Amino acid sequence: MEARSWAPRGHLCPPGSMLLAFASLLGCLLTSSQARVYSRCELAKVLQDFGMEGYRGYTLADWVCLAYFTSGFNTAAVDHEADGSTNNGIFQINSRKWCKNLNTEVPNVCQMYCSDLLNPNLKDTVICAMKITQQPQGLASWEAWRRHCQGKDLTDWVDGCDL
């Protein structure tokens, strides 16, 4: 019987993709250790402390509803889109326009890394969300808000919260 020799038939992954995969994994591990899932009342209180009540005409209930339907109140939520962009943090802010991921050619309107949007203290997230809300669409920039929150009675989202 003839012995077979094993030799790689070429690269299984394009050059640099292993480094990209490792960096992504490392980023996930670092941010997941800081993950926080807020309760609706905890989130409402934090957003109130940041001055979000009434910002651009939106209530705390609007923001809490948005956070629930985008991330389930999870600060470390990251969703990968087919175009390679990511939705990041409790409000699922997209890297296509608002924050900097690995692609350096994006506008980065919020002037921050997308990983900054995963921080449980929410400071960077609130700053970026305020910039998004300054756009003509306001909270309607988020499909989840249009679909689940817009035009609805949202009082239950903050009902019983000590604000």
From Swiss-Prot:
Is Secreted set as a keyword in this record? yes
Broad class of the protein's primary localization: secreted
Question: Domain C-type lysozyme: where?
Answer: 36-163
- What domain of life does the native source organism fall in? Eukaryota
Q: Where in the cell is it found?
A: Secreted
Q: GO cellular-component terms in the record?
A: acrosomal vesicle; extracellular region; sperm flagellum
Gene3D superfamilies recorded for this chain? 1.10.530.10
Give the signal sequence positions. 1-35
A molecular function annotated in GO for this UniProt entry is:
lysozyme activity
Relate the assembly described in the record: Interacts with ASTL.
What's this protein's function? Sperm surface membrane protein that may be involved in sperm-egg plasma membrane adhesion and fusion during fertilization. It could be a potential receptor for the egg oligosaccharide residue N-acetylglucosamine, which is present in the extracellular matrix over the egg plasma membrane. The processed form has no detectable bacteriolytic activity in vitro.
Family named by the database record: Belongs to the glycosyl hydrolase 22 family.
Q: What is this protein called?
A: Sperm acrosome membrane-associated protein 3
Show the taxonomic lineage: Eukaryota, Metazoa, Chordata, Craniata, Vertebrata
